[in-house]
Amino acid sequence: MICITTPASTFDEFAKRLEPLVNEGQTLFVVPGSGGAEFAFYNLIQKGMILLGMQRVHSISRLKTYGQSVYMLGRKEELHIGTIPADAVDRYKEIVENLFSIKTDTLPNYLNVTLT
């Protein structure tokens, strides 16, 4: 699984660099999954990658001391994920729940991820 947490403005360049390195069946996990990820990573999806996106970030943090520490303001009580193709979403529910230790719900399609 390849996890991307960069701003949406970096997606196009990231997709270009990633394209020669990926294989069918690999997973690209975008957090958050909005920002046009489905368009930026279209060629990777066409190569058979699974796009997994989370509606929102799992927690919020703020800078405490520059270059030294941050603090967490809070965590979501529940996460929502979607995939392209849509029928792949169920296999990621447990993975995301274990990764973040937060209850995770699956969405019927990726459009639900983008319209948040």
What are these regions (language model features)?
Residues 2-3:
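N-terminal Rossmann-like NAD(P) cofactor-binding module of classical short-chain dehydrogenase/reductase
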Residues 7, 33, 82-86:
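Structural motif
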Residues 65-116:
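Internal alpha-helical scaffold of NAD(P)-dependent oxidoreductase catalytic cores
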